[in-house]
């Protein structure tokens, strides 16, 4: 496993991390060039110049979609009369297998505060909210202390750095709903409404929180902004090994020797992360499959491990980069059981607004449970494939259902024999269940 040496030039997000994993508070953060990007932005650049720099740097959203951050910012209204604007940080990190934002908020809370300060100035937003996953109790404590420190130091509040710019920042904890990761459901929840997605248009940039222009960005996205302003566009583009600029928090979980996450340049291959950083599979286990970016991404196989971790390459392979925290599956894990577990989560977390999602996901779970018990019926696999089509992109209000069926459709594609083994056979009472030969099963016919 590689010995990681973090420097400001190669690890703009994580170089300030302490070895004892304690949070970096204001004095230490400022001693390590903290708020230098904010100083340059607020005292030397106009809001439009900041938006242009972020756009030119090629910063893409780190929440999974990979949309241009600068372009998203430029969609905010130019009308100066619309002077009530909001900046929302989507910190509702509930994707199974993903924990990157938690690291940043717990150990580098001032990095997020600085990123939001610069972003708010660029967007002309006077108030910001960090919508935080309710279970992230330690992150909430650390963020609130960081906000208090920044306010006392004149880095938040009124007339910041003597520029006349005012910005207040608040932490709002969620109530444990996965769907709040969708930006309009997050806005509804923040307003005290039912957490279901809104119809688009209007988009949040024109009508968001309380009907006002609103920009929603992910934690890691906002944490990239200070380094771009402090070090420049060219530097940010050059630290990547890909046409996707910058670095990304990437990692592997599952039964690997050293599960974790690391800040790596875009273009690093999945095999490098698995073998050089995560240490490979545990002794006695064979690699079987992986999900590149969390539970809601398509499975890929060992043949795809040499792909660079970047949005386009993973997309062309039939999956999504997502959060870039991959989950490794070993040969002892049955795909039917694994997918059933994932679909149970997604079915439970559906907001119930759309009929296909509300009824289709529980239906898939019912079929998967039958296949897992060896009691599947002929045609069940075809029904699952049909459900994947019915729940695909454009069939529901938001991307919850399309993301939910990605692991299902890809598991059937690559491991169909494991699903076929769960179909009840009238002339045999032995089955290959989930890739493992069990004892004789009792006849059920």
UniProtKB/Swiss-Prot annotation:
The keyword Translocase applies. [4Fe-4S] cluster binds at residues 351, 354, 357, 398. FMN binds at residues 174-221. Its cofactor is FMN; [4Fe-4S] cluster. Belongs to the complex I 51 kDa subunit family. The keyword Transmembrane helix does not apply. One of its GO terms (biological process) is cellular respiration. This is NADH-quinone oxidoreductase subunit F. It comes from the Bacteria. Its EC number is 7.1.1.-. It is an enzyme of class 7 (translocase). NAD(+) binds at residues 61-70. Composed of 13 different subunits. Subunits NuoCD, E, F, and G constitute the peripheral sector of the complex. It catalyses: a quinone + NADH + 5 H(+)(in) = a quinol + NAD(+) + 4 H(+)(out). Keywords: 4Fe-4S, Flavoprotein, FMN, Iron, Iron-sulfur, Metal-binding, NAD, Quinone, Translocase, Ubiquinone. SUPFAM superfamilies: Nqo1 FMN-binding domain-like, Nqo1 middle domain-like, Nqo1C-terminal domain-like. One of its GO terms (molecular function) is metal ion binding. NDH-1 shuttles electrons from NADH, via FMN and iron-sulfur (Fe-S) centers, to quinones in the respiratory chain. The immediate electron acceptor for the enzyme in this species is believed to be ubiquinone. Couples the redox reaction to proton translocation (for every two electrons transferred, four hydrogen ions are translocated across the cytoplasmic membrane), and thus conserves the redox energy in a proton gradient. Gene3D superfamilies: 3.10.20.600, 6.10.250.1450, NADH-ubiquinone oxidoreductase 51kDa subunit, NADH-ubiquinone oxidoreductase 51kDa subunit, iron-sulphur binding domain.
């Amino acid at each position: 496993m590689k010995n990681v040496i973090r420097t400001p030039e190669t690890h703009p997000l994580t170089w300030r991390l302490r070895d004892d994993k304690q949070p970096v508070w204001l004095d230490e953060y400022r001693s390590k060039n903290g708020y230098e990007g904010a100083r340059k932005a607020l005292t030397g650049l106009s809001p439009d110049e900041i938006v242009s720099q972020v756009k030119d740097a090629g910063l893409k959203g780190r929440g999974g979609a990979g949309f241009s951050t600068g372009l998203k910012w430029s969609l905010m209204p130019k009308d100066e009369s619309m002077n009530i604007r909001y900046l929302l940080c989507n910190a509702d990190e509930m994707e199974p297998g993903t924990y990157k934002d938690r690291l940043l908020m717990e150990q580098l809370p001032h990095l997020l505060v600085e990123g939001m300060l610069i972003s708010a100035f660029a967007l002309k937003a006077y108030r910001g909210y960090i919508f935080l996953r309710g279970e992230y109790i330690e992150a909430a404590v650390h963020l609130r202390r960081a906000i208090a420190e920044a306010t006392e130091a004149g880095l938040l509040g009124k007339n910041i750095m003597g520029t006349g710019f005012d910005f207040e920042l608040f932490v709002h904890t969620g109530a444990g709903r996965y769907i709040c990761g969708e930006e309009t459901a997050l806005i509804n929840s923040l307003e005290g409404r039912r957490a279901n997605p809104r119809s688009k248009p209007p988009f949040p940039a024109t009508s968001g929180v309380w009907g006002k222009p609103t920009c929603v960005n992910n934690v890691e996205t906002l944490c990239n902004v200070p380094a771009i302003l402090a070090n420049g566009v060219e530097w940010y583009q050059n630290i990547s090994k890909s046409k996707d600029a910058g670095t990304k928090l990437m990692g592997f979980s599952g039964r690997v020797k050293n599960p974790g996450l690391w800040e790596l340049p875009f273009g690093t291959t999945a095999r490098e992360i698995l073998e050089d950083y995560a240490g490979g599979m545990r002794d006695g286990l064979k690699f079987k499959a992986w999900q590149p970016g969390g539970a809601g991404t398509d499975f890929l196989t060992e043949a795809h491990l040499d792909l660079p971790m970047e949005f386009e390459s993973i997309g062309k392979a039939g999956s999504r980069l997502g959060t870039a925290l991959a989950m490794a599956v070993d040969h002892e894990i049955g795909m039917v059981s694994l997918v059933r577990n994932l679909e149970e989560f997604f079915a439970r977390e559906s907001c119930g607004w759309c009929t296909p999602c509300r009824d289709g996901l529980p239906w898939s779970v019912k079929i998967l449970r039958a296949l897992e018990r060896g009691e599947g019926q002929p045609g069940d696999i075809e029904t699952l494939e049909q459900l994947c089509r019915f729940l695909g992109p454009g069939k529901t209000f938001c991307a919850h259902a399309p993301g939910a069926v990605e692991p299902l459709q890809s598991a059937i594609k690559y491991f169909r024999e494991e699903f076929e083994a769960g179909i009840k056979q009238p002339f045999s009472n032995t089955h290959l269940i989930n890739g493992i030969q069990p004892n004789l099963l009792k006849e059920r016919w």
